[in-house]
Regions:
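Short, conserved beta-strand element in jelly-roll/cupin
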Residues: 16, 35-55
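Conserved short histidine dyad/triad with adjacent acidic residue
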Residues: 13-37
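Short, small-residue-biased leader/transition segments that mark boundaries at the very start
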Residues: 3-4
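Histidine-centered metal-chelating micro-motifs
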Residues: 50, 70-71, 75-80, 100-101
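Short acidic-glycine-tyrosine-enriched beta hairpin
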Residues: 56-74
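Double-stranded beta-helix
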Residues: 82-127
Length: 127
């Protein structure tokens, strides 16, 4: 049992419905890993979205997610997903079983940019 907690992999699928609050897309809460050096992979299954990333220096960038796209999230990088389409958006993830999650950092300080719809397109806007 314990060896899988230390050396295993977790897999998960997330579903995000389309929509916005104001002009900000529906998104996941976002997190760093508790074991900050742990990486993660995301891949698109259905619909379209954006992977929003922020390093420990609070630099923010985004990558377009679509069915079949594969994305590497290095250790030390916070991440969240947003549904930028008009249909259900789903993606899969794989991460080390000892990565843990640190949601508190994002809850307390947020991301340094927001993904908003501007002129009908997703755009990162610094805060």
């Amino acid at each position: 049992g314990d060896v899988y907690k230390r050396q295993g992999l977790y897999f998960g699928i997330t579903y995000l419905h389309p929509g916005k609050v104001g002009n900000e897309y529906f998104m996941t809460k976002g997190h760093f890993h508790a074991n900050i050096d742990r990486a993660e992979f995301y891949w698109g299954l259905e619909g379209e979205g954006m992977l929003i990333l922020m390093d420990q220096l609070r630099r923010v960038w985004a990558e377009r997610i679509f069915p079949g796209s594969l994305h590497y999230i290095p250790g030390g990088v916070a991440h969240r997903m947003a549904n930028t389409g008009n249909t259900l958006f789903s993606f899969a993830a794989c991460w080390p079983s000892d990565a843990g999650h640190n949601y508190r950092e994002i809850a307390d300080h947020g991301f340094a940019a927001r993904l908003l719809e501007v002129d009908g397109k997703p755009q990162l806007i610094g805060v």
